[in-house]
Each structure stands twice: as structure tokens, then as C-alpha cells.
Regions:
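Catalytic core of soluble alpha/beta enzymes
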Residues: 1-112
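Flexible C-terminal active-site loop/helix
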Residues: 110-179
Length: 179
């Protein structure tokens, strides 16, 4: 298909509910089930993943804060895709460390929101699969930065003509939000 259907439960279900919902979602063609239960419960996550099998990918990790957390998650067999957020996991260095650990487990990675931030580091990460494109984050990026990455036909393309991430902070536009 041209489009894949993802569901983000944000840890809303119990393990039993998550398995039941996964069966329903699979019938609707869902291919990605993000945080079906709280990612704090790695043993339960691994049980959900085992029960779901190959019907869809189980993704989590956006609340991970360092390489140790990601290693524990992967060692527990809790995810099919390790999702990371550079704003939480020690920046680009932590993101790339997590990606290297995921690669050692044969696990692809994904980035949690902030596409203009994550696209560049994602391109440098082995096994990088996708960036979560969440409307509110994109709206904030547009509002506060020149050079944000617009999506076209479901794809993001890094701007290779600008240095670094290509973002310039809009100081005047941000001033109204200062506290």
C-alpha cells in the first residue's frame, strides 16, 4: 500500500487489553502499534510483542534517556522498533549510541517527533526507519524556526544547502512566549 496505518496508544492499555486491541488493529491493516502499554514495564511489553507476533511492529522507547535504558529494552525483547527522542536521550550522541545498540540487536530505529531535529541524525544512524511526523511539533517548528523541513508526498528531505540542521531560531516570533 501507499500508506501505512500506525496507532500510538501512549501506554494506555493493560497487557491484556493491548493484545486484544492489536488483534482488532491487525484486521484493519495497522502495521505499527506504538507504546501499547507503558514502556516502563519491559517484561509485559515483551509479552505483548510475543502475543502480537508478526502481525504488526511494536514500537517504544521515546521516553528513554540513555544507552542503558535502550539496552534493557532491547535485551527484554520489548520492541520491534526502538523509538528514540534526541531531546530526552542526551542529544545526538545519545541517539546515535541508542541506534548502535539497536543495530547490534538487529532492531530498526525511529525518531519521536521533532522532524526537523531528527531527520539529520536519523540519516546518520544505522537502521533508521522513520520519523514520527506529529502535527503539533511541526506547527511549533514552523512557528519558531526558519528552515524547518516540510513533508512532501509523505517524505522529508534534508536541506543540504544550509549548514548544520539548517534551522534558524526566530527570536522576534518567540519573544511573545518568554516567561
Amino acid at each position: 500500500p501507499d500508506t501505512e496505518l500506525f496507532v500510538d496508544a501512549n501506554g494506555a492499555y493493560s497487557a491484556r487489553q493491548a493484545v486484544a486491541m492489536a488483534k482488532e488493529f491487525a484486521e484493519q491493516g495497522v502495521v505499527w502499534f506504538e507504546e501499547p502499554i507503558s514502556s516502563d514495564y519491559l517484561l509485559e511489553m515483551s509479552r505483548v510483542r510475543a502475543a502480537v507476533g508478526s502481525r504488526m511492529d511494536i514500537a517504544a522507547g521515546e521516553y528513554g534517556y540513555d544507552a542503558r535504558y535502550f539496552r534493557h529494552m532491547l535485551h527484554a525483547g520489548a520492541v520491534d522498533v526502538l523509538q528514540m527522542d534526541a531531546t530526552r536521550c542526551l542529544g545526538f550522541t545519545g541517539f546515535l549510541q541508542g541506534a548502535a545498540i539497536a543495530a547490534s540487536f538487529g532492531c530498526p530505529t525511529s525518531a519521536h517527533c521533532a522532524p526537523s531535529l531528527h531527520m539529520h541524525v536519523g540519516c546518520a544512524a544505522e537502521g533508521f526507519r522513520n520519523v514520527e511526523y506529529f502535527h503539533d511539533h511541526v506547527r511549533i517548528e514552523q512557528m519558531l524556526f526558519d528552515g524547518f523541513l516540510p513533508q512532501k508526498d509523505g517524505r522529508l528531505t534534508p536541506d543540504l544547502s544550509a549548514p548544520g540542521m539548517g534551522l534558524t531560531f526566530k527570536h522576534k516570533d518567540a519573544k511573545q512566549y518568554a516567561v
